[in-house]
Amino acid sequence: MSLTGLPDIRKKIGQFHHLRIYKQILSFQGNFARLNYFLGDVFPANLRSASVSVFFEVRLGPRIPDCIVLLKSVDVKDEFAFHCYFFEFKTTLGKSTMQSVHHNCIHQAQYLQGLRQLQQSISFLDQYLIADEVSWNVVPVICFFRQWGLKLDFFKKFSGKTKRLSFSFIRDLFARSQDGAVQSLLSIPNYTNFRRACQKHTDLYRKRCRKAPKSVLTKTSGENRSRASRQVAKNAPKNRIRRTAKKDAKRQ
């Protein structure tokens, strides 16, 4: 099954939850333990003191990985000067596992699409290899989050690839290739305003606004019934109304 066959509303909801994941990562950027826990403890313990840079939706040729986490190692025993993690996030309504990736057609399509995204994104860096530069450890990771509560259900960390790259050049490449609209959204400090802006960005806000509130619908229905009653009374024959009035008077 291809993900292109999913309804547009499901894709928009997925985009909305991606933005929520990005916001959480930014909030944990200064806390290695919380960031590592949120992403499945994929970072080794020797990077606890590393400086962390985070980039979102970086365009690398035909591919746009969801998130790139760049860690500058300060461990003198580390064979790599830099560790670069490419993340692909998938969100699901229900729980996802390795078993569901094999048997659930949607989870399987998400997983395979994520693998292609990661593979091609990392391969894009090969054109910038420099023989006498420092060694990088480039690691692809795919994560499945449940939309309710942003719970990490399942992740897969793949073997890293060694590449020799210029830190200043690659860091600048990542920074300038980020999606500007996403950066603007993530800069909103207030969470309520951020949530509303994300809904508007993903077109969810306008879809919900098209539905009139229930109270408005009830009020409108009542008004219509009152108008209908008045119209019936207006159209009724006058002599019939008078006879009815006389009968009511006699009963009294």
From Swiss-Prot:
The keyword 4Fe-4S appears for this protein: no
Statement: the UniProt record of this protein carries the keyword Oxidoreductase: no
Residue segments, region Disordered: 215-252
Coiled coil: none
Predominant subcellular localization, coarse grouping: virion
Biased composition range(s): Basic residues: 237-252
Gene Ontology cellular component list: host cell Golgi apparatus; host cell nucleolus; virion component
Annotated compartments: Virion; Host cytoplasm; Host nucleus, Host nucleolus; Host Golgi apparatus
Keywords recorded for this protein, A-Z: Host cytoplasm, Host Golgi apparatus, Host nucleus, Late protein, Virion
Protein's UniProt name: Protein UL24 homolog
Organism of origin: Human herpesvirus 6A (strain GS)
